[in-house]
């Protein structure tokens, strides 16, 4: 993963309305194994996050200036340090306006993955821990806690430059601590949501279920194709890459690689050629689960309508082909 440029600044800010104090670095970070490892770990943590949103830049304006500064950098009108400095000063201002915001180290990294260039911007925090030193003493230790990555964005620079109609070249973590906490960071990026990841994923899964039903596939074949879809989409999610419908179609049916893709287009599901899959929605598709009042039920989604029948009006499930161990337990209880 070649790293073109990388720099870190610090904004000291507590969520109590106090001023945000900027400690800006004057030069880029030199290339090192530590930087490589940091970016690799950051990518892994970011890709694993649930609840990301996808979108595109607002039109450049005084309220959303980042895209203009980024364009100046890419056009070599600003160097990377100058770009990051003016950007972090803007973030400092937005933090001061958001009383709930907390400061931290702001990472800017321009890097390449495969043939694609990205800009990552992340707010990083430390965790306190302990370490054992060379003298075998236990000492306090601070480290960047990438597991607590709550505010970060990734801009696909190649997509932004080459596809003017794209509405999903920016992804960002929406945050779990309330809408207002993360809104200032989204406004800093200047991003408007263009793609509903969970909604697009649900539509894709609905299209797949309709396809399986229309093909009247045997249970084993349906299970294999379901597994193929989930594994491919999950892998793409881990890589931070979108699901490509044509590629997915060729994996689902190697003998008829366009069958599923043509089904989607002919039925007009309104799906884009590439969609950002949502991990949580995929997991729900893999299995149905529920627990209440001492009862726990879990079964693979493809069994619904076959070995498991749901009567919505009566609110009941009929399960066929019970596991032998469960049948034995029930018989012993009856005896």
From Swiss-Prot:
It is found in: Cytoplasm, Nucleoid. GO terms for cellular component: bacterial nucleoid; cytoplasm. GO terms for molecular function: double-stranded DNA binding; single-stranded RNA binding. Its main location: cytoplasm. PANTHER family: NUCLEOID-ASSOCIATED PROTEIN YEJK (PTHR38772:SF1), PTHR38772. HAMAP family: NdpA. This is Nucleoid-associated protein PputGB1_0980. It comes from Pseudomonas putida (strain GB-1).
